[in-house]
């Protein structure tokens, strides 16, 4: 590779992977504590109230690393099959 070529960095793929990883961990923690993870995550996304998410395994801290609008964006893209 020549030193004159510009390398393009795609942050969206790493952001998508991080969002998926965090949501999976939060989902698993909610399941282990006996909660309905979909209902709890929807409550959090709508209200912004982190108490919808358990502290178990640091799930609440993890989900707060992501912006709610970014989570919704990734979920919507996945639902619609948009890359």
Curated annotation (Swiss-Prot):
Pfam short name (any one): IreB
Cysteine-cysteine disulfides: none
InterPro entries: IreB
Matching PANTHER family: UPF0297 PROTEIN YRZL
Family recorded in the similarity comment: Belongs to the UPF0297 family.
Listed name of the protein: UPF0297 protein CKL_1325
């Amino acid at each position: 590779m020549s030193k004159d070529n510009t390398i393009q960095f795609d942050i969206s793929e790493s952001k998508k992977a991080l969002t998926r990883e965090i949501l999976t961990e939060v989902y698993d923690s909610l399941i282990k504590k006996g909660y309905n993870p979909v209902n709890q995550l929807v409550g959090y996304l709508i209200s912004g109230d982190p108490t919808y998410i358990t502290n178990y395994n640091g799930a609440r801290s993890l989900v707060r690393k992501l912006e709610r609008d970014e989570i919704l964006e990734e979920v919507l893209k996945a639902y619609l099959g948009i890359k």
